[in-house]
């Protein structure tokens, strides 16, 4: 009996020696598993839970509450320990993890011993309890125990404006952009305007010649002038210059030129004015017209007495027009376009026309002073060849206009010296024009005493052609002059003055 007891004690001692290393090995393995798989937090939680519970195993397997620890088994028989181990029920705990949506699932225990779901099965992102031991999940291989990177939201950190982030107007370049854009637009607009103006000026029709104010007044007073008459007046009013071969108007008022006549007289040369009454036998009425003009008021005289230098530009303008007029062949449409001259073609025929009839001498009643006045000496007999009497066509022909032969008119040697000196003394009137000639003619017809020179009617037939051309030129003579106050009738002191 004593021998059996000794053998049993030896076995129990050997068995207790074998259990102690196994318990220490299990604890070391559990610590290594928690450090490698769950990290410091999960491992600490596992270790703390295992230490707090004290009755569970470190690998997640529960121990029966009635089974004491290995240290308490010392001194117990081996059969009792084996029976207690077989009767104990173990279960697993599923650790906490982050699922596929980034949500954290807490750990849970598979301790449903009645149904047998004691093991943690499934995948790392979806875990559940099962009762098949070979399907349980090795949780140490899973890595979803920490929050994923894509779930972590960036922290909204407010950056305070430092000295480098402050607004500096000198570094702002937006104003320069606006200025440059506006400048380019303005430059394009100005360039377009200048281009438009230049294009209009380049394609503008040529302007008409600016007529001098004095020339415009003269043309306005003359009215519509035939072309032949205009040529006649222009050619008779200008002289050819030997130096520049340009027409130059004679500026001398008293231009004495000897005239070739059929009968040469040794007396003094007569005055040859520019188609004025000096070539007409009406000097008495000429002097009376100046007598009327002598009574003009001071205001009118000051208006008439103008500076001749003002007409220098008019003189040059007339010379230029005359030069261009005879140099251009197609001048008729140009003159007609200006509306100043009608289109009357110059007749260039060289045929001799039929002899013209001399106009009948007007019959005038002699006044009392004419009858009582002493007889005036008649001039010498005037003889003029018939071929020297020119017609209108010959007078207005191109050869006659360009010729240097002066127009012939009968000499007047018995004119009243008083009338001639009085006419010449009036220097405020420059040159007698056809307007004044017609004005003298009207005065002569109204005053028979002006025709006391018997020779005055003899030269009327020779100058009828010239006076006929000048008579149709002026439609208004005295009416176009300035208003002359005062009475203009020349009294003859005759009570029996009758005009037929």
Swiss-Prot record:
UniProt biased composition (Polar residues): 240-255, 448-464
Extracellular face of the membrane = 26-174
PTM sites of type Phosphothreonine = 433, 477
In terms of one coarse class, where is the protein primarily found? membrane
Q: Where is this region: Disordered?
A: 52-73, 240-269, 349-378, 444-470
Q: Which domain of life is it from?
A: Eukaryota
Q: How does it sit in the membrane?
A: Single-pass type I membrane protein
Q: Does the keyword field hold Protein biosynthesis?
A: no
Motif position, PDZ-binding: 497-500
Gene Ontology CC annotation, any one: asymmetric, glutamatergic, excitatory synapse
User: Where is this chain glycosylated?
Assistant: 32, 59
Sites of Phosphoserine modification: 391, 397, 409
Signal peptide residue numbers = 1-25
User: Which GO-annotated molecular functions does the record name?
Assistant: ionotropic glutamate receptor binding; PDZ domain binding
Q: Name one Pfam family in it.
A: Shisa_N
Tissue expression, as annotated, is: Expressed in the developing ventral mesencephalon.
Record's keyword terms, sorted: Glycoprotein, Membrane, Phosphoprotein, Signal, Synapse, Transmembrane, Transmembrane helix, Wnt signaling pathway
Which BP terms does GO give this entry? Answer: excitatory chemical synaptic transmission; negative regulation of canonical Wnt signaling pathway; postsynaptic neurotransmitter receptor diffusion trapping; regulation of AMPA glutamate receptor clustering; regulation of short-term neuronal synaptic plasticity; spermatogenesis; Wnt signaling pathway
Residues on Cytoplasmic side: 196-500
- Transmembrane residue ranges: 175-195
Provide the family line: Belongs to the shisa family.
Assembly notes? Component of the postsynaptic hippocampal AMPA-type glutamate receptor (AMPAR) complex, at least composed of pore forming AMPAR subunits GRIA1, GRIA2 and GRIA3 and AMPAR auxiliary proteins SHISA6 and SHISA7. Interacts (via PDZ-binding motif) with DLG4/PSD-95 (via PDZ domain); the interaction is direct.
Q: What does this protein do?
A: Involved in maintenance of high-frequency synaptic transmission at hippocampal CA3-CA1 synapses. Regulates AMPA-type glutamate receptor (AMPAR) immobilization at postsynaptic density keeping the channels in an activated state in the presence of glutamate and preventing synaptic depression. May play a role in self-renewal and differentiation of spermatogonial stem cells by inhibiting canonical Wnt signaling pathway.
The record's domain comment reads: The PDZ-binding motif interacts with PDZ-domain of scaffolding protein DLG4.
Q: What is this protein called?
A: Protein shisa-6
Q: What is the organism of origin for this protein?
A: Homo sapiens (Human)
